[in-house]
């Protein structure tokens, strides 16, 4: 194990109070299981925070942005320049994620992990650049192992800052033209699947472009097969700067026992890497939604995840993760505030 992964000392969420927590949930004034996915969600949060009183404090949305060398091959409906333009849009408050964060009470931070050209003279963008776009993965490694280590360290410092500010829930979004190619390649490498089972249309590419995207990812996997000896090596060969930093931030947030809300396909690929590095991370992950991207359901099944929402989203940015916050808060509130049968003087139906 490398020094960078040794920095993450992640404990599993405690299951010592499971019987007490489950009984508390079951004795609320409702039939057992009647609140559906909110009930195991409350159990998960109580394992992390303790069984007495649950809370969400300073929920924070982190949107990680980076460009991808493979995008020059036309694997997306948009050119790489759109990454920078969208980062500017985030900074100016005009994107879907800005709207949802304002509506739902999220603090929003945008992190430039390595877009092609930095946005200068605009407040609200955190500079954590690892380069000006990754290498084209079908021709060369995306980045060096040292770059992965640096990205993890940056992400750990970012999470520590928010933890010190009292944040106990962090949600993950991303922006990067071409990053569905990187995420699909990571999925295929780690889960040992055929590329066809992992690659999808992203934001809506044609069938011809889809075939080219699949071919390029197959070339990338063949090129780097011998070098991908572990999850960090997979990131170095196939990852994006934003995927690396999301992975590191998920590891760091789990280390600090924070709730980690995972968005769609790309964020789930980062979660897949994080869980492969340290299986205890899984205890802290809340999967917000099932996206329209081909392969996302396979990853969710691999991670034994039942997402809270299925809205047909395929935007990214953390939009699905943002929309899940009211459901997470609902799980907290019913656990804290709902009467038990004995409190209400109602005959139990357990």
UniProtKB/Swiss-Prot annotation:
UniProt keywords, alphabetically: Cobalamin biosynthesis, Glycosyltransferase, Transferase
Catalytic activity line of the entry: 5,6-dimethylbenzimidazole + nicotinate beta-D-ribonucleotide = alpha-ribazole 5'-phosphate + nicotinate + H(+)
EC number, UniProt record: 2.4.2.21
Matches recorded under SUPFAM superfamilies: Nicotinate mononucleotide:5,6-dimethylbenzimidazole phosphoribosyltransferase (CobT)
Enzyme type, top EC level: transferase
Protein's pathway: Nucleoside biosynthesis; alpha-ribazole biosynthesis; alpha-ribazole from 5,6-dimethylbenzimidazole: step 1/2
A molecular function (GO) term: nicotinate-nucleotide-dimethylbenzimidazole phosphoribosyltransferase activity
Pfam family, one: DBI_PRT
BP terms from Gene Ontology: cobalamin biosynthetic process
Database matches in CDD domains: DMB-PRT_CobT
Active site per the UniProt annotation: 317
InterPro entries in the cross-refs: Nict_dMeBzImd_PRibTrfase, Nict_dMeBzImd_PRibTrfase_bact, Nict_dMeBzImd_PRibTrfase_N, Nict_dMeBzImd_PRibTrfase_sf
Similarity field: Belongs to the CobT family.
Role this protein plays: Catalyzes the synthesis of alpha-ribazole-5'-phosphate from nicotinate mononucleotide (NAMN) and 5,6-dimethylbenzimidazole (DMB).
Protein name: Nicotinate-nucleotide--dimethylbenzimidazole phosphoribosyltransferase
Organism: Shewanella sp. (strain MR-4)
């Amino acid at each position: 194990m490398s020094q960078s992964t040794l920095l993450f000392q992640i404990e599993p969420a405690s299951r010592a109070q499971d019987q007490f927590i489950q009984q508390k949930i079951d004795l609320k004034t409702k039939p057992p299981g009647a609140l559906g996915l909110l009930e195991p969600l409350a159990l998960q949060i109580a394992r992390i925070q303790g069984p007495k009183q649950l809370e969400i404090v300073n929920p924070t949305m982190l949107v990680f942005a980076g460009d991808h060398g493979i995008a020059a091959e036309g694997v997306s409906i948009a050119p790489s320049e759109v990454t920078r333009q969208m980062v500017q849009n985030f900074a100016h408050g005009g994107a879907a994620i800005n709207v949802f964060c304002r509506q739902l009470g999220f603090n929003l931070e945008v992190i430039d992990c390595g877009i092609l050209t930095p946005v200068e003279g605009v407040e609200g963008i955190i500079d954590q650049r690892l380069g000006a776009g990754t290498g084209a993965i079908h021709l060369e490694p995306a980045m060096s192992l040292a770059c992965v280590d640096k990205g993890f360290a940056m992400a750990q410092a970012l999470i520590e800052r928010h933890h010190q500010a009292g944040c106990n829930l962090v949600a993950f979004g991303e922006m990067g033209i071409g990053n569905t190619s990187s995420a699909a390649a990571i999925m295929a490498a780690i889960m040992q699947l055929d590329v066809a089972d992992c690659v999808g249309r992203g934001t809506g590419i044609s069938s011809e472009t889809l075939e080219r995207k699949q071919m390029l990812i197959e070339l990338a996997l063949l090129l780097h097969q011998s070098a991908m000896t572990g999850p960090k090596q997979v990131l170095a060969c196939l990852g994006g700067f934003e995927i690396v930093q999301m992975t590191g931030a998920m590891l760091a947030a789990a280390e600090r026992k924070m709730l980690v809300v995972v968005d769609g396909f790309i964020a789930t690929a980062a979660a897949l890497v994080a869980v492969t590095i340290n299986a205890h991370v899984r205890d802290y992950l809340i999967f917000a939604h099932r996206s329209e991207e081909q392969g996302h359901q396979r990853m969710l099944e691999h991670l034994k995840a039942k997402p809270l929402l299925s809205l047909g989203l395929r935007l990214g940015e953390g939009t699905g993760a943002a929309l899940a916050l009211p459901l997470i808060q609902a799980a907290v509130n019913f656990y804290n505030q709902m009467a038990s049968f004995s409190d209400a003087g109602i005959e139990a139906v357990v």
